[in-house]
Amino acid sequence: MKKIAIDAMGGDFAPQALVEGANQALQEFSDIELILYGDEAKIKQYLTASERVSIVHTDEKINSDDEPTKAIRQKKNSSMVLAAKAVKAGEADAVLSAGNTGALLAAGFFIVGRIKNIDRPGLLSTLPTVEGQGFDMLDLGANAENTAHHLYQYAKLGSFYAESVRGIKRPRVGLLNNGTESSKGDPLRKETYELLAADSSLNFIGNVEARELMNGVADVVVTDGFTGNAVLKSIEGTALSIMGQLKKSILGGGLKAKLGALLLKDSLKELKSRLDYSDAGGAVLFGLKAPVVKTHGSSDAKTVCSTIRQIRTMLHTDVVGKSVTEFSKEETQ
Amino acid sequence: MKKIAIDAMGGDFAPQALVEGANQALQEFSDIELILYGDEAKIKQYLTASERVSIVHTDEKINSDDEPTKAIRQKKNSSMVLAAKAVKAGEADAVLSAGNTGALLAAGFFIVGRIKNIDRPGLLSTLPTVEGQGFDMLDLGANAENTAHHLYQYAKLGSFYAESVRGIKRPRVGLLNNGTESSKGDPLRKETYELLAADSSLNFIGNVEARELMNGVADVVVTDGFTGNAVLKSIEGTALSIMGQLKKSILGGGLKAKLGALLLKDSLKELKSRLDYSDAGGAVLFGLKAPVVKTHGSSDAKTVCSTIRQIRTMLHTDVVGKSVTEFSKEETQ
């Protein structure tokens, strides 16, 4: 029985979305146990499950605008910190939160702790492609700076994830660069390229450009945290802007446009669901001793349930354990 | 009378699109003269204008897959190199090409030459926002690496451009970063932030995130060439993927969806035209002694004409001359 510690107080719709997501997941999976950290009375308002679930009460919580490292240090009894400590103490196998991302990164780093020989855990998400398979990208912003060796470790971690959690055999690894030729990029990219090309255990397919990401050009895309963050936010911002404009065009387009939209409803819905990658779960801070997963602050119960499913798969396939074994071989850098 | 040198042989639809764009521009503007470089017989097939236009014949051209610097050095009689040389010799005031971007950057850098005290010219484009005003971003990839001082110069250049060419008073300058707080980012961002904040001649509004770019959060956005290239390609790739998926959903959605799309036609067209920023012209390699402008390889006559309009505005407002004056004050770095 795998145990997942849930920060029930983080996110825009806490605790309702978290607790209802927990209800769903407990129905769907008989082999998990959930521990909910937060305000017991409020949690009980929404909790319908009665087996394999427990509540650890606390009044304290971390807010979305708290300074991350300070919050972790000062709010020792917050729902997020208690959830992370449960993993540290061996009382839970993984943490899920929809709260303050920076604080969760800090909690993961300082409380759960890094895998030996991994200097800089990276933030990994599965992002959508037009054909639906998706791709895993990291680092999406856990770090503001990375070395070539970090990126090399991300290629390994991303490959483990794509293979274990998404079932992709010999995942194709691409290095995000400003052109596809092997000579492209700044010194960081050139050095990373050499490291990736030299390791035959990786299925390295060379440089990939941001324009091709949604076309499924690679299964795993590695980049530094600064660029990854900018690319992720560009994709999100563009998708939101276009969908918003489409809606505006329809609403401002008179009766004809509205009738057209009504007839197109199913097609538009299908488009939206293809672009919506919340089914793939949340963002994993990968490189820690246990899964620490952030789901969107705006997550609803369904997304929370998907994220619990993702964590369950990570635990069942022991992707973290495999990483520990692999990186223990590395000489300390 | 301003003279614009046009590489008539570069781009997917050369020379037709270039020559037809020239025809249109000559009709629209009575105060410009165009010099077309390329295959005279082919150019004449499409040339309808007879005044203020001349052809300089050459058989040589640079291909899209030529190695840029080598091509510039070896193909001395190519249409692109001859156009750049005409500017260098004072026979033309600006260059336009739809050909090999890298080669045009090299031609700009080595033939047209940099403005004194500008180390690294940057690639600037006007990109779309949902409200239609757009924003200017640089560097979009002329450089793989930049220093804080380069980014500071881009803020000045971008401000000149937005004010002169787009008529925006005291343009708001944002620094692309991985968060809006002033303490965010890697050392490059932190150092750039200090430089921008210390210069009261700039209307610096602080850090901006990639997610907000299309919402018009700033008029000028500065970043290093690697990140700018990744962000530009992410925006383009996402927009193309979504529009492609929308089309696919409609085509695969049966009669109902097709009828809906027919009724929505005007709204979808309006959406497309809002996202299409070819009206704003091409990408300017800014920081050179004359306007060197790249229009998309796939540009049609209308886009070529828009780019000629853009160059005409740059020449009439003397945005390059203003930059020369401004940067001549700087101590050599």
Swiss-Prot record, chains A, B:
Task: Give any single GO term for biological process.
Answer: phospholipid biosynthetic process
| UniProt cross-references to PANTHER family, sorted A to Z | FATTY ACID/PHOSPHOLIPID SYNTHESIS PROTEIN PLSX, PHOSPHATE ACYLTRANSFERASE
Q: Name one GO cellular component term.
A: cytoplasm
Cytoplasm keyword on record: yes
Under Enzyme Commission nomenclature, its number is 2.3.1.274
Q: Which reaction does it catalyse?
A: a fatty acyl-[ACP] + phosphate = an acyl phosphate + holo-[ACP]
Q: For this UniProt entry, what is the primary localization, expressed as one broad class?
A: cytoplasm
The protein's matches in Pfam families, at most eight in alphabetical order, are given as:
FA_synthesis (PF02504)
Origin organism is: Streptococcus gordonii (strain Challis / ATCC 35105 / BCRC 15272 / CH1 / DL1 / V288)
Keyword set, alphabetical order: Cytoplasm, Lipid biosynthesis, Lipid metabolism, Phospholipid biosynthesis, Phospholipid metabolism, Transferase
| Molecular function terms from GO | phosphate:acyl-[acyl carrier protein] acyltransferase activity
Q: What is the lineage of its organism?
A: Bacteria, Bacillati, Bacillota, Bacilli, Lactobacillales
- Write down what this protein is called: Phosphate acyltransferase
What is the role of the protein in this entry? Catalyzes the reversible formation of acyl-phosphate (acyl-PO(4)) from acyl-[acyl-carrier-protein] (acyl-ACP). This enzyme utilizes acyl-ACP as fatty acyl donor, but not acyl-CoA.
Under the subunit heading, UniProt states: Homodimer. Probably interacts with PlsY.
Instruction: State the family named in the UniProt similarity comment for this chain.
Output: Belongs to the PlsX family.
Its pathway is: Lipid metabolism; phospholipid metabolism
Location comes to: Cytoplasm
